[in-house]
Amino acid sequence: MRIWIDADACPKAAKELVCKFALKRKLEVWMVAGQPQVKPPFACVRLVVVESGMDAADDYLVEQAEPGDLAICSDVPLADRLIKKQVAALDPRGREFDARNMGDKLAMRNLMADLRDQGQMGGGQAPYGERDRQAFANALDRLLTRLQREADLRASQPHR
């Protein structure tokens, strides 16, 4: 299992938490970005800066991630693409994307985009704070535990 991060949009505090969890659990982290980033100084972390272009980093992430991997992203359409590929997805505020909630999340995202386009709503999310960081840490721990159990179960079953 690998952890993928949509690095352009992920808060630094969330990236640092992912690295800590990955070190503890001996997992690889792949940070994918469309803009140059500072790579954390850990051997388990890889940084891929893709050529610029609309959705180039998202496309790379979707192409490379495999079922059973985990992606950290706040981009709802990207999460939808990953979920369809059986890649788990979690946003940096600790909210998990899954097949059951994707329809609602896409509809809400589209509604908010329409309202912003019409000038009826401004701004974006609130700044990333300690409450977000704690919610993310808790959700990340739970999700990694579940994914590792599922991977262990698959590995212990005879191949057909």
Curated annotation (Swiss-Prot):
It holds the Pfam family DUF188. It comes from the Bacteria. InterPro entries: UPF0178. Belongs to the UPF0178 family. PANTHER family: UPF0178 PROTEIN YAII. This is UPF0178 protein PA5247. It comes from Pseudomonas aeruginosa (strain ATCC 15692 / DSM 22644 / CIP 104116 / JCM 14847 / LMG 12228 / 1C / PRS 101 / PAO1).
